[in-house]
Amino acid sequence: MALQFEAFCAGGLAPGWSLTVQGHADAGEDKFEINFLTDAGDIAFHVKPRFSSATVVGNAFQGGRWGQEEVSSVFPLTLGEPFEVEVSADTEHFHIYAQEQKVLQFPHRHRPLATITRVRVLSDHQLAQVELAKRGLSWGDGGY
């Protein structure tokens, strides 16, 4: 998969932000993921729509290994169609929406959230837009 978007934040993640990815699901199956990373190399949150099984999977990679997957069978995405995926966070969970429909709620496994300093979007699908939006204090001291 190709790196389509990467953002760094020296101040780290805080509740109240959202990441929205819009594109067209025109490539092969299972070629899209979003990763929230720490400076230590952990993946604090990994979300991947799996077209082959019509599921959305959330997980975390900490201490050199993957945790237990959380899987949602709510899957409003279709290959060959435009898509929108949004990930937002509050103090307890990541919330994942696809086509404006909530598909997964994933509890924070990595704390403090401020140690999450990078977000990457990898995709072989055509992406039209990737946007980080603030709702109050979000990424550290306001810097992306």
From Swiss-Prot:
InterPro entries: ConA-like_dom_sf (IPR013320), Galectin-like (IPR044156), Galectin_CRD (IPR001079). One of its GO terms (molecular function) is carbohydrate binding. Pfam families: Gal-bind_lectin (PF00337). The modification Phosphoserine is found at residue 138. Residues 5-133 form the Galectin domain. Disulfide bonds: none annotated. Lens-specific. Located at the interface between lens fiber cells (at protein level). Keywords: Lectin, Phosphoprotein. The keyword Phosphoprotein applies. The galectin domain is atypical and does not bind beta-galactoside sugars. Homodimer. This is Grifin.
